[in-house]
A protein has these predicted regions:
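Sec-dependent signal peptide recognition
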Residues: 2-8
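C-terminal motif of bacterial Sec signal peptides marking the signal peptidase cleavage site
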Residues: 14-15
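GGW-centered surface loops in extracellular recognition modules
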Residues: 23-39
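Functional-site microenvironments in short loops/helix caps that host divalent-cation chemistry
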Residues: 29, 95-212, 217-226
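Glycine-centered tight beta-turn/hairpin loop motif at sheet-sheet or coil-to-beta transitions
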Residues: 31-36, 45-47, 150
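Active-site microenvironments of metalloenzymes and redox enzymes
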Residues: 47-139, 234-240
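Outer-membrane beta-barrel "beta-signal"
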Residues: 229-231
């Protein structure tokens, strides 16, 4: 009888702890049919949720269209200022539908996070470097210099890592916030596989925009950084609907 009682208590204890664990959720976006799958990540400094994939053009284009629409210029998207049009095709001909958005500056990435926050009931941001590293657990495939055929690839077309997150390494590098300002982490389709991961941390340089013929050069787009993309995080969990 005592053994059965101990077993019953163990079952109850396990059942009671489950509700405290962060769970995955789908982020809907007001005024669109698009959703973002958000993956929970447990951290000693506080749980957070990270987008399962890099942000695709499908959603980034909605942001651009909304920001640049004449009907919304005065609205300002709740004080979010949008990027100016890019010179040339910012997708470089790699692909649009299902492909990661590329070439945006840190300023544009932060503006996108602000816009998404204004369309949801959560605050979104670029990950800190610490958050990115915690989410960069083992496993998962990667698009890199030797298998990418010199192009980005559609999101979620390799194996996810052990948390269920796609393309943390490779495909496109991703903006993170560091003590020294925004940087791009993780490596991209232009790097060899051994260079993918947190060791590849790039500081924006003038060379990323040297062929932009506009003067002044765009603060929103990089004419020569087709390897830059983004994903977002939030600390507002699945119950914050």
């Amino acid at each position: 009888m005592m053994k059965n009682g101990i077993a019953l208590l163990a079952i109850v204890a396990v059942g009671c702890s489950a509700p405290n664990e962060p769970t995955q959720f789908n982020q809907t976006i007001e005024g669109t049919d698009f959703t973002i799958e958000m993956i929970p990540v447990q951290s000693p400094t506080g749980n957070f949720w990270i987008s399962q994939t890099e942000i695709p053009w499908d959603l980034y284009d909605i942001f651009l269209q909304f920001i640049n629409s004449p009907d919304n210029l005065n609205a300002g998207v709740d004080a979010v200022t949008g990027p100016t049009p890019a010179y040339g095709s910012v997708d470089r001909g790699y692909g649009r539908n299902g492909y990661p958005a590329i070439s945006m500056s840190a300023q544009a990435a932060e503006s996108f996070a602000g816009w998404l926050s204004s369309r949801t009931n959560r605050t979104y941001s670029i990950p800190t470097m610490a958050q990115w590293k915690i989410a960069n657990v083992g496993g998962g495939g990667a698009w890199h210099q030797w298998n990418s055929e010199k192009s980005t690839h559609p999101i979620a077309t390799t194996e996810p890592n052990t948390l269920g997150i796609y393309d943390m390494r490779g495909n496109v590098g991703e903006w993170v916030i560091t003590d020294d300002g925004p940087k791009v982490i993780g490596g991209s389709f232009r790097n060899p596989p051994e260079a993918l991961g947190p060791e590849t941390l790039l500081t924006p340089i003038k060379g990323w925009n040297v062929t932009d013929p506009q003067l002044p050069r765009s603060p929103w787009w990089f004419a020569d950084a087709d390897f830059v993309g983004l994903r977002l995080v939030t600390i507002d969990g699945d119950s914050n609907e």
